[in-house]
From Swiss-Prot:
One of its GO terms (cellular component) is cytosolic small ribosomal subunit. One of its GO terms (molecular function) is structural constituent of ribosome. It comes from the Bacteria. Transmembrane segments: none annotated. This is Small ribosomal subunit protein uS9. InterPro entries: Ribosomal_Su5_D2-typ_SF, Ribosomal_uS9, Ribosomal_uS9_bac/plastid, Ribosomal_uS9_CS, Ribsml_uS5_D2-typ_fold_subgr.
Amino acid sequence: MIGNWNYGTGRRKSAVARVFIKAGKGDIVVNGKPIADYFSRETSLMIVRQPLELTNHGTTFDIKVNVSGGGETGQAGAVRHGITRALMDYDATLKPALSNAGFVTRDAREVERKKVGFHKARRRKQFSKR
């Protein structure tokens, strides 16, 4: 992007977020909408703001996010991961605090696939003795 933007890519489940941050007054825009309009759950808003509150940069940056795939929780986690990486791109000294909070590590949990002969991933068919 043009200007002094810092970039970070975040992933969670099947969601991918591309996050751009620059000095500003604290506006967060997700897919062209204000964050409060995009995420309906209060927990999703809290998850997205966690790295900013931890590093005391809540009103320091304007953040632009493009996120796709997954559901609301996965997208919120992907945005948090992307914001964390963008903050580390902006200032590498923030990494220890973000790492101790667990925001740097990508949450590798994915949906387990359904197996043949099972109802779901692990739910077996009912056993009948006779």
